[in-house]
């Protein structure tokens, strides 16, 4: 039984490093063009080079997303893009469009191509066709069940890898192919600029009664009729593995480093726990609780156990659940004194009970007994943005460890 790859989002160089530090086997990133995430910080050429070195030095992989649905005006620029990224050493490029796929095969035949979920990979015949053209992996559409994926795996070539989303936001449209944003805001979702109108509040208007807004659902705020819950499959690692998925993908290139650290860490531990003893494996609910400590919508298993029902949507609000705040990030740690140097992110005080998450280790809880500013003067509260503070911690930490506090 092959251990699947844990694939994490890297919306910036910092997030790429965080994902790798917290246990990702591979990270997918976007450049400043063609990557379908305008809202992400994305990578300059210099960032790409540094990120690739950071990953490869640690035996990890980096995939480059180039999965927009291009117009004629994009083609010449894409050729320049290929020539620029070709020598960098990416482990694969994600493509959704057949024309861009053909250009990649012609101009950089040595770079593996993964076919993006934007290509609606929902049946095995499509996958076989992509494989014949040279694809090494297809990213499955989110609209597939475990049963369908297992059948898919059986009917495709053994060397064709399967990647599937296991956690994160769900699009109401078919694997991200949506024109609501284009129609309502002029922002092209298939060029990476989606305004997420599926999360907006809607009411009903009857043609002969202009100006009379009626609730679609019995709620004074209207209803959020397109508003999906977030995907979460951490309770189903055995099913994910047994269905034949090669790479388990976490959504979220526009999420924070804290989000990436928490989600990657939880899935890393649960995957490793399963493979340590598959026969006697039982799910550790503490990891689900960990996933609830980031900003998220209520969770669902999506299509994995069949078509979603009314319980897969959130009808009354598009707000996130935010029960914890990131309050600081460890920059360095002195093992002799037990003192951590921390960059403050959110206000916290002496006497607060906090949790500290660490790369590849369990989190721990402690009380802030004392802290000083960078000059060594004792302080009662860390309330200045990006303030450097020093604090004794009760267990060893490393650079990149994060402090959080329940609201």
Please identify what each model-predicted range represents:
Residues 104:
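RNase H-like DDE/DDD metal-dependent nuclease/strand-transfer catalytic core used by mobile genetic elements
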Residues 76, 110-111, 115-122:
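Gly/Gly-Pro- and Ser/Thr-rich, intrinsically disordered tail segments characteristic of DNA damage-repair
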Residues 64-65, 95, 115-117:
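Short beta-strand elements of ligand-binding domains
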């Amino acid at each position: 039984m092959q251990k699947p790859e844990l694939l994490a989002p890297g919306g910036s160089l910092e997030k790429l490093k965080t994902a790798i530090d917290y246990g990702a086997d591979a990270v997918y990133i976007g450049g400043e063009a063609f990557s379908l995430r305008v809202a992400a910080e994305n990578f300059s050429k210099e960032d790409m080079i540094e990120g690739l070195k950071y990953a490869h030095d640690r035996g990890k992989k980096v995939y480059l997303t180039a999965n927009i649905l291009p117009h004629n005006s994009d083609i010449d620029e894409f050729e320049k893009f290929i020539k620029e990224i070709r020598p960098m050493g990416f482990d694969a490029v994600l493509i959704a469009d057949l024309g861009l796929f053909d250009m990649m095969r012609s101009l950089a035949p040595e770079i593996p191509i993964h076919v993006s979920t934007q290509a609606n990979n929902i049946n095995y015949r499509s996958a076989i066709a992509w494989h014949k053209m040279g694809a090494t992996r297809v990213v499955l559409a989110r609209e597939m069940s475990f049963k369908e994926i297992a059948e898919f795996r059986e009917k495709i070539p053994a060397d064709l890898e399967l990647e599937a989303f296991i956690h994160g936001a769900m699009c109401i449209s078919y694997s991200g192919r949506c024109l609501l944003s284009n129609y309502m805001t002029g922002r092209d979702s298939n060029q990476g600029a989606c305004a997420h109108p599926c999360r907006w509040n809607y009411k009903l208007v009857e043609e002969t009664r202009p100006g009379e807004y009626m609730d679609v659902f019995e709620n004074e705020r209207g209803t959020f009729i397109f508003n999906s819950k977030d995907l979460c499959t951490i309770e189903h690692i055995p099913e994910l593995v047994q269905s034949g998925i090669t790479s388990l993908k976490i959504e979220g290139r526009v999420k924070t480093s804290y989000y990436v650290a928490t989600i990657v860490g939880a899935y890393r531990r649960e995957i490793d726990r399963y493979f340590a003893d598959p026969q006697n494996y039982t799910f550790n609910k503490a990891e689900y609780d960990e996933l609830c400590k980031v900003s998220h919508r209520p969770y669902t298993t999506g299509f994995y156990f069949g078509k979603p029902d009314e319980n897969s949507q959130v009808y009354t609000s598009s707000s996130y659940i935010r029960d914890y705040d990131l309050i600081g990030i460890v920059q360095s740690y002195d093992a002799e004194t037990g003192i951590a140097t921390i960059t403050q992110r959110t206000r916290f005080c002496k006497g607060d009970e906090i949790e500290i998450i660490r790369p590849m280790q369990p989190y721990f809880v402690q009380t802030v007994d004392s802290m000083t500013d960078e000059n060594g003067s004792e302080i009662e509260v860390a309330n200045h943005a990006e303030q450097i503070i020093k604090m004794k911690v009760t267990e060893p930490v490393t650079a990149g460890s994060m402090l959080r506090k329940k609201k």
